[in-house]
């Protein structure tokens, strides 16, 4: 699995839309292997989604004038996905709202110079416990990944906060940038099927995007 780029095998070949075009918010989703339940979750938050292939250029996505950007879940090693790392860097540089889950979470870390590593035992299943450091509460999450973000390097970065940790092995389960509209989680916060007590990412993103000065976008 180390060094294997699998996203090109599962990503959509052409853009498509999901949700209500009259929704108050538009989100550009970068398809790294996106699940339909994630799209349904976004649509349920009154978000209109345009799903782009993983290798779409930033300029092409920006033309759609989304309110925010989303890096999806997906398979394989995040390190070979250089185009998506560069895409995340450009979004962050412009301070557009950006959030990611699973593989997208790892891409955001790599875009900030935080390395990832192959885990000895990956996290698989619907009952992975994490602690939310911002609320102090535990959450049961659905996870399916074999790579993780390097915690030691992340802890040394003054610009990023660890928001969630896995309770079994203390791996990073969530992060947030201090001065940018960017955050991510390592798990699948989906509405159905499975656990639904971790839907924070869509509601938080919607609130954040709605309150950010988007320059008329």
Predicted regions and their residues:
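Pocket-forming structural segment of enzyme catalytic cores
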Residues: 85-99, 105-199
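Flexible gly/pro-rich beta->alpha loop and the following alpha-helix that scaffold active-site loops
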Residues: 35-100, 112
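Hydrophobic alpha-helical segments, chiefly the membrane-spanning helices
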Residues: 213-217
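Conserved small/polar residues in nucleotide/adenosyl-binding loops
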Residues: 201-208
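Internal, non-catalytic "lid/hinge" segments that mediate substrate recognition, gating
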Residues: 1-26, 36-40
């Amino acid at each position: 699995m180390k060094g294997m780029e699998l996203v090109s095998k599962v990503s959509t070949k052409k853009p498509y839309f999901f949700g209500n075009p009259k929704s108050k918010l538009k989100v550009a989703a970068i398809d790294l292997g996106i699940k339909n339940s994630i799209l349904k979750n976004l649509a349920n938050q009154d978000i209109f989604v345009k799903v782009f292939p993983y290798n779409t250029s930033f300029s092409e996505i920006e033309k759609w004038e989304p309110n925010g950007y989303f890096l999806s879940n997906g398979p394989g090693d995040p390190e070979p996905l250089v185009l998506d790392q560069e895409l995340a860097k450009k979004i962050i540089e412009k301070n557009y709202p950006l959030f990611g889950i699973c593989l997208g979470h790892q891409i955001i870390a790599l875009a900030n110079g935080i390395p990832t590593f192959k885990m000895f035992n990956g996290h698989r299943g619907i009952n992975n416990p994490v602690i939310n450091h911002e609320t102090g509460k535990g959450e049961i999450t659905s996870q399916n990944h074999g790579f993780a973000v390097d915690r030691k390097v992340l802890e040394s970065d003054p610009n990023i906060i660890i928001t969630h940790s896995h309770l079994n092995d203390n791996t990073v389960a969530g992060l947030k940038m201090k001065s940018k509209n960017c955050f991510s989680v390592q798990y699948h916060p989906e509405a159905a099927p499975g656990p639904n007590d971790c839907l924070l990412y869509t509601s938080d993103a919607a609130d954040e995007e709605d309150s950010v000065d988007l320059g008329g976008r």
